[in-house]
UniProtKB/Swiss-Prot annotation:
<dbReference type="InterPro" id="IPR008271">
    <property type="entry name" value="Ser/Thr_kinase_AS"/>
</dbReference>
<keyword id="KW-0106">Calcium</keyword>
<keyword id="KW-0418">Kinase</keyword>
<dbReference type="GO" id="GO:0005634">
    <property type="term" value="C:nucleus"/>
</dbReference>
<feature type="domain" description="EF-hand 4">
    <location>
        <begin position="482"/>
        <end position="516"/>
    </location>
</feature>
<dbReference type="GO" id="GO:0005524">
    <property type="term" value="F:ATP binding"/>
</dbReference>
<dbReference type="GO" id="GO:0106310">
    <property type="term" value="F:protein serine kinase activity"/>
</dbReference>
<feature type="modified residue" description="Phosphoserine">
    <location>
        <position position="237"/>
    </location>
</feature>
<feature type="binding site">
    <location>
        <position position="427"/>
    </location>
    <ligand>
        <name>Ca(2+) 2</name>
    </ligand>
</feature>
<keyword id="KW-0519">Myristate</keyword>
<comment type="similarity">
    <text>Belongs to the protein kinase superfamily. Ser/Thr protein kinase family. CDPK subfamily.</text>
</comment>
<feature type="binding site">
    <location>
        <position position="496"/>
    </location>
    <ligand>
        <name>Ca(2+) 4</name>
    </ligand>
</feature>
<feature type="compositionally biased region" description="Basic and acidic residues">
    <location>
        <begin position="21"/>
        <end position="36"/>
    </location>
</feature>
<dbReference type="GO" id="GO:0005737">
    <property type="term" value="C:cytoplasm"/>
</dbReference>
<keyword id="KW-0547">Nucleotide-binding</keyword>
<feature type="binding site">
    <location>
        <position position="459"/>
    </location>
    <ligand>
        <name>Ca(2+) 3</name>
    </ligand>
</feature>
<feature type="binding site">
    <location>
        <position position="429"/>
    </location>
    <ligand>
        <name>Ca(2+) 2</name>
    </ligand>
</feature>
Amino acid sequence: MGNCLAKKYGLVMKPQQNGERSVEIENRRRSTHQDPSKISTGTNQPPPWRNPAKHSGAAAILEKPYEDVKLFYTLSKELGRGQFGVTYLCTEKSTGKRFACKSISKKKLVTKGDKEDMRREIQIMQHLSGQPNIVEFKGAYEDEKAVNLVMELCAGGELFDRILAKGHYSERAAASVCRQIVNVVNICHFMGVMHRDLKPENFLLSSKDEKALIKATDFGLSVFIEEGRVYKDIVGSAYYVAPEVLKRRYGKEIDIWSAGIILYILLSGVPPFWAETEKGIFDAILEGEIDFESQPWPSISNSAKDLVRRMLTQDPKRRISAAEVLKHPWLREGGEASDKPIDSAVLSRMKQFRAMNKLKKLALKVIAENIDTEEIQGLKAMFANIDTDNSGTITYEELKEGLAKLGSRLTEAEVKQLMDAADVDGNGSIDYIEFITATMHRHRLESNENVYKAFQHFDKDGSGYITTDELEAALKEYGMGDDATIKEILSDVDADNDGRINYDEFCAMMRSGNPQQPRLF
């Protein structure tokens, strides 16, 4: 079981997010330079603890008594939903100021390593808070169900969204973005932190203002640097991971590589190392051939290409440092970067690259819900055997025990990865339909008959097309829909641009790409 990457590279895969593939470490234990007991509660006065005797001690992830974030903040609309939690808009009761509250379900923090990682992320955000281009951290609160992180509200949206919305795009604009990203790297390294997961999705705009700052918002894989230590655990996101990470011998230079990948995308619209599978991406990274021949590279300045080459140098000892990048003639403030517009096709490719095709994921779930019982009799029995408390859902502990009974020797991290891959709605457990979707052979799920049934499910009026209204209704039924997502899906799937999806387009979507994904069994 698992996939061939685990055999060749010793790593496990996370579910795809926002059109990119991610890798998760085998061993997530990381070093800290800070006492967990010094984690801020976010208040200047002694907090009104609720039953501290009951809620203190080892049970608390933050190693402090529980504290209700709602005593200090009013939580309102949902801003976003990720693999590990939900982000809400929140308002501080004492000042009326607006912040973002990231709520991480404790069901997702099942291993000792998960809890250590959570504490470390908070420590690092506290350590870096107040620096330019880094989100300001307000405080951490823990209750019975979740750990809540309150931080600066970045109301300007995602980095790529802003670039795409502008229309006009130039080397100077790309240099401005890259300068802020590398400034984050420079600050992190100066303050003894290695980020380890730089990618566009981890940067937001501070406001909708034209001159808004770019802010780094996610430090979940970051570590305090131990001088002289060689890091070996494989972390990061597939397109952005440095070759030395795959070789399991790396240091802080990996952050410059990731920033160089982002710069390549900013200038061309696509990553330099591309393949349909994670294995293909990693093989391309290790081979290290960078394409400067295809469009738009012939029209990109030599100075820009020089910086990309220096940042994507295979040997980390010869790779340019963050401080040196900031002094490069093309990147520095008022430098050589031209304001001449870059080919508009770059923006189009960038949009396609970042668009996650949520419709395909939803279609597989619909197929699993409606598949004939006789086809899945064995899987049904397997689900019942693993669901030992007959709750109708499989918890992490049940999955771990069930795999052990089948003779599996997976590590805790690998079991956790399988759990996350199967848990589509992110509630910390696997329901029956999620189990079927994750365990059935993909070719059976995607048979012509099943694909047609899924199309009919979305095509409510039987017109032969999935309209915008039908798409919106289907996505919202599963809590996946917003206007931006619908537009991205249509852009990605609607080949003839008539504003609706016909059966041929739907089939092409279901057959395309099919990157290798982890299966439970």
